[in-house]
A protein has these predicted regions:
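Short, Lys/Arg-enriched anionic-surface-contact patches
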Residues: 2-7
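Acidic, low-complexity, intrinsically disordered interaction modules
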Residues: 9-56
Length: 56
């Protein structure tokens, strides 16, 4: 599974701005709001956001 580096960077950069205020539910909502694609790729995208938020 190869993630688009530009998308990953954009997600990480944007997420760093919200890191202090985001909870688990907010992180999932944030991942969806970032326009993650459907299926496995969306899951990977959401997991990346959750990892950035400090969740295992």
């Amino acid at each position: 599974m190869t993630a688009n580096p530009q998308v990953t960077i954009a997600i990480r950069a944007a997420h760093l701005r919200y890191r202090k205020n985001i909870g688990r539910h907010a992180a999932w909502q944030y991942a969806k709001s970032r326009g993650c694609p459907m299926g496995v790729y969306r899951l990977a995208c959401q997991l990346t956001v959750l990892q950035d938020a400090g969740y295992p």
